[in-house]
Amino acid sequence: MPAQIIDGKTIAATVRQAVKQQVKERIDSGLRAPGLAVVLVGSDAASEVYVGNKRRACEDVGFRSFDYDLPITTTQKELEKLIEELNDDDAVDGILVQLPLPAGLDATPILERIRPDKDVDGFHPFNIGRLSQRIPALRPCTPKGIMTLLEHTHVDLHGLNAVVVGASNIVGRPMSLELLLAGATTTVCHRFTKDLSDHVKRADIVVVAVGKAEFIPGEWIKPGAIVIDVGMNRLPDGRLTGDVEFSVAAERAGWITPVPGGVGPMTVASLIENTLQACVDYHDVR
């Protein structure tokens, strides 16, 4: 029996509509709209697309959008100075610096300079630390979005075997923390993992984020498993595909995310949720 599709577009639209309604209620009651500052350095084509999506989503739900498009010649000190200014701006609830940064700029001190209560990407060590201690504050967007997708399957994750393929700071590592928090028995696989197929074949939940087209053969998927494909890869013929061999996996899995239309929309929706959360929990005048 073919897998049920986890429709990220539809779920993300529901999340954004809920945020939009809350923003309307805030404004109607005399409170200000949440504000999101998006910083783009240089003119990387893919980054421009991602930033455009985030800014449109911001405006769609009624946020104030503060746009900073900086030249590729921007220095480390100039970028750090801008972050400090945004930290001190009471109209800004969230600060997002689009990654990757151009060569010559070090992202780590930039991201650590963002105040944790304005770190709506969820990358600051404070927010990662809170997640690891089981007291999450602002959660990393892609893993948070994936957890929302999993909630919509109505599958109880407690005790299930979860395998995360990929150990990046953006997805793999925080994803493992989210799954642990949800009660799953969690394994993280990476480039040094031996017998990757054995790990995947026993997994009730598989999250793949490696950035390699169809890296995971569909035949590895355990019958009935939940498959979350974070990858977004463009083939020579122009088609987009994920990190999992979808056509075969979809015949074995119980649930599966498509590419595109699965995880991607949820990342932006989670960013919007985090910005509202930062505004309400940390910045509203009590």
Curated annotation (Swiss-Prot):
Q: Does the keyword Hydrolase apply?
A: yes
Swiss-Prot/TrEMBL keywords: Amino-acid biosynthesis, Histidine biosynthesis, Hydrolase, Methionine biosynthesis, Multifunctional enzyme, NADP, One-carbon metabolism, Oxidoreductase, Purine biosynthesis
- Reaction(s) catalyzed by this protein? (6R)-5,10-methylene-5,6,7,8-tetrahydrofolate + NADP(+) = (6R)-5,10-methenyltetrahydrofolate + NADPH; (6R)-5,10-methenyltetrahydrofolate + H2O = (6R)-10-formyltetrahydrofolate + H(+)
Give GO MF terms, alphabetically. methenyltetrahydrofolate cyclohydrolase activity; methylenetetrahydrofolate dehydrogenase (NADP+) activity
Task: Provide the E.C. number(s) assigned to this enzyme.
Answer: 1.5.1.5, 3.5.4.9
Presence of the UniProt keyword Oxidoreductase in the record: yes
Q: Which GO terms describe its biological process?
A: L-histidine biosynthetic process; methionine biosynthetic process; purine nucleotide biosynthetic process; tetrahydrofolate interconversion
- Which GO CC annotations does the UniProt entry carry? cytosol
The transmembrane residues are: none
Q: Which residues bind NADP(+)?
A: G166, A167, S168
Can you state the subunit structure given in the record?
Homodimer.
The entry's family comment says: Belongs to the tetrahydrofolate dehydrogenase/cyclohydrolase family.
| Record protein name field | Bifunctional protein FolD
Organismal lineage: Bacteria, Pseudomonadati, Pseudomonadota, Gammaproteobacteria, Alteromonadales
